[in-house]
Amino acid sequence: MSDSSQLHKVAQRANRMLNVLTEQVQLQKDELHANEFYQVYAKAALAKLPLLTRANVDYAVSEMEEKGYVFDKRPAGSSMKYAMSIQNIIDIYEHRGVPKYRDRYSEAYVIFISNLKGGVSKTVSTVSLAHAMRAHPHLLMEDLRILVIDLDPQSSATMFLSHKHSIGIVNATSAQAMLQNVSREELLEEFIVPSVVPGVDVMPASIDDAFIASDWRELCNEHLPGQNIHAVLKENVIDKLKSDYDFILVDSGPHLDAFLKNALASANILFTPLPPATVDFHSSLKYVARLPELVKLISDEGCECQLATNIGFMSKLSNKADHKYCHSLAKEVFGGDMLDVFLPRLDGFERCGESFDTVISANPATYVGSADALKNARIAAEDFAKAVFDRIEFIRSN
């Protein structure tokens, strides 16, 4: 038996296994009715949200229902109780005339969470941030529209946000959108798919994109003559969608390739996850130290980066002496540009991947692990998202 024959057999078995695993998760979601975002609020609970009171919620709901608006309700004994979805709450804020984020800023802000060290929670941070910013109780009034652009051929972000598009042949990927230079309408209709949390979309990636990245210069010369090879993501995708979203998050692999350079060239702000394990921390510092050279390399080739700043944050942090020591070293390096909130090492972040969920989209009623562990991870993700939002708000307003 030749080596190529064995490779093909293993590849076929791997493809079959991927399909089986995906079908198992999907069947479980169908059985448990877990294909929609589970979180709802009782009407009385809305009084705890910013700018809302029990009285003005009652008044707004009455007015909206008189005009024909239908709120979500669920049976509770012999009566029907309000079960407010996040869209219901956003509509209440809109009815009351509360300004949205897009009323302050007309164009999307591009966030890139990056580190050349693999396994430092780049993707988990990105997808958790996307879902948490949308669903955070204190950010619902902003009605944030969020897009995740997956440029990692491993398509992990796609798996978390829309797992059906993370296996098999996917033709409408972020890399293809960049190369084909399609219209805004085609991007929205053909290349962007919704996640389980309404208001958060993803532009998928595929393993085939790795071949595109490796031949990027030649492909750009063939399909996009005259266009700067580092500006393709910004010009062919992001600039066309900047009025349709408030935040665009880019996820790329841990490789110094064309996709990472395009992500850097398109980003308004960079977030660097810093894992506290000594070897990983050292590798991360090497990346941070060489970052100015990388930005200069992109600029020298005719594409100006528009980075406002690079913010560091700790990922996978636990209550250990060596982790605390690395945290203090990170504060020395980043100073005031160190995020004061970190993403801890929690079981919830890891277990959610078993059902292709984030800690925000995972339903506690069907979650396979500890409900308390999921709750702690969700709180950590929400705190992280609020800290990121507040830092960006400070930067944009100054």
Swiss-Prot record:
It holds the Pfam family HTH_54. The keyword Lipoprotein does not apply. InterPro entries: AAA_dom, DNA_Partitioning_ATPase, HTH_54, P-loop_NTPase. Keywords: Plasmid, Plasmid partition. GO terms for molecular function: identical protein binding. It comes from the Bacteria. CDD domains: ParAB_family (cd02042). One of its GO terms (biological process) is plasmid partitioning. SUPFAM superfamilies: P-loop containing nucleoside triphosphate hydrolases (SSF52540). Belongs to the ParA family. This protein is essential for plasmid partition. It ensures the proper distribution of newly replicated plasmids to daughter cells during cell division. ParA is trans-acting. This is Plasmid partition protein A. The gene is parA.
